[in-house]
């Protein structure tokens, strides 16, 4: 499937037209937040709950995409295993921003250090499901 087709499927499955808050979770989003804040080291407390406005994020994404992975790897907030893949993540985030802009009024991401595994665990705990 093309990326465009996958985005269309996402919108049909979960309409976002009424969304006011968009949360970016873990991975690329937390790295982008650290970069946007100019952190000298990765700081989960500074990242969790931070806001990335689309206008500023677009500038950061273009800068990041233009850097070769060996230069990205020199930045202490970019995990060594992410330096070569963060460019692809940046392209994906740009696509997500475009999707959001076309379908709702939100113009920023709020960043969460928590990821899908945290959500699954919280859901199971709420259900009282033993594992």
PLM region spans:
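Helical "lid/coupling" subdomains associated with nucleotide-phosphate turnover
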Residues: 4-8, 12-131
């Amino acid at each position: 499937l093309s990326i465009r087709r996958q985005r269309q499927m996402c919108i049909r499955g979960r309409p976002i037209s009424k969304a006011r808050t968009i949360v970016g979770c873990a991975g690329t989003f937390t790295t982008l937040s650290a970069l946007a804040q100019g952190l000298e080291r990765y700081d989960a407390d500074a990242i969790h709950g931070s806001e990335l406005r689309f206008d500023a994020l677009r500038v950061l994404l273009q800068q990041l995409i233009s850097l070769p992975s060996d230069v990205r790897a020199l930045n202490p907030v970019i995990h060594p295993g992410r330096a070569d893949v963060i460019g692809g993540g940046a392209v994906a985030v740009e696509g997500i921003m475009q999707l959001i802009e076309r379908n709702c009024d939100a113009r920023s991401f709020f960043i969460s250090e928590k990821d899908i595994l945290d959500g699954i665990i919280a859901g199971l705990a709420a259900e009282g499901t033993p594992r």
